[in-house]
Amino acid sequence: MTDAIDQLFPAHLQHVQALADRALEREGYDGLVVYSGRPGLHFLDDHGPAFKANPHFLHWAPLQEAPDCFVRYLPGRRPQLVFHQPADYWHKPPAVPTAAWTREFDLTVIREPAAARGLLDAGNRRLACIGELPAEFAEWGFSATNPAGLLAYLHYHRAAKTPYELACMREASLLGAVGHVAAEKAYRAGASEFEVHQAYCSAVGLREQELPYGNIIAFGEGAAILHYTTLGRRRDVPRPTFLIDAGAQFRGYASDITRTHIADAAGTDPTFLELMASMEKLQLELCAAVRPGFDYRQIHLLAHRLIAGALVQSGVVTGCTAEQAAENGVSGVFFPHGIGHLLGIQVHDVAGLAADDSGRTEIPRPAGHRYLRLTRRLEPGVVVTIEPGLYFIDLLLDEAQQNGLGRYIAWDVVRRLQPYGGIRIEDDVACTASGAPENLTRDAFAKVA
């Protein structure tokens, strides 16, 4: 599979160069330098968080663990990769890359970051630089650092993925599916949340710092906390449900997958079982709506109508129709987040609200839906998450009792269901030119079944 993906890289890099050509011409620059970044330190400490490469750098070169590296690009020329391999006996220096993709670059190895200055110099040309630059780079003569117009153009067009990027995301999805299967097995064997997390990391072969985001491993009521990352150490806790939101990465591209499991159908409240079945059905319906030209906001609003229908049908919501529950805010008590987001190099990929590539105008969220991360129309190559949720969150339920929405809620049913926490199902779905969406997540689970 790696060889097949390598064959897609040259066309991907040509696409990245073409984006840079247009962005540089529009913004009045002669060339581009992209800096990979440098690890920082914790306050008053000589240790710091794990290094995370600049996503713009990863768009050019799949080097996740390569600090103080640069890509320099002048339109019409081969891109230059300046690779920093320090002379260091405290830490193992990164190996000079030799993979097939490096043939597309002029590769130069340096021992000190300062040595890059002369290599990046382009005479009187106006160079824009993208990255978080250390103070000592301030005098290197870049015409601009992180210019807004340039970033806006590149961010907007990064939404549509190349065949290479889609191939990487399929691999990330496959890794994630393997991890999810291992995690469910550990849960059913009685492991703690922390031990389930360890089983996941072991199965995907990634250190915690290499995951695209912190794993959400929640038993029971913990599933009602949207970003529950506590990872409890005890095994002897209530565990009627298991919600896992965990992804993987391949060459810098992420997967973002959520599943909800029950411990034992026979011992589970029938109403919760009904809601589980309804959420599975409606999630697939929402995935099917990922088609070219479709307004993602409409998928979000459809999710509210469908979830409202499940709440009314199950008896959790009473005294109003599903349509009314979606309009009056009752559905938001149980589904308080957006239906999803763009996915790619970054888990919450950029420019989700952008009206165009100028960066000056945003497409507004629907009124009352402030947490929606994507408002654009879909186009071929775009990958989005579809993640409807239904939760029993104390804070929001308390607010409903205070603001009048509580009159539509069957509190006896809610109290019965609160120990289960909630339900979320999340797939990564690619919009295709043919119209039929490609569900990266479901395809991956089918391969590991």
Summary of predicted features, one role per range:
Residues 1-449:
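Active-site neighborhoods and metal-handling regions in enzymes and metal-associated proteins
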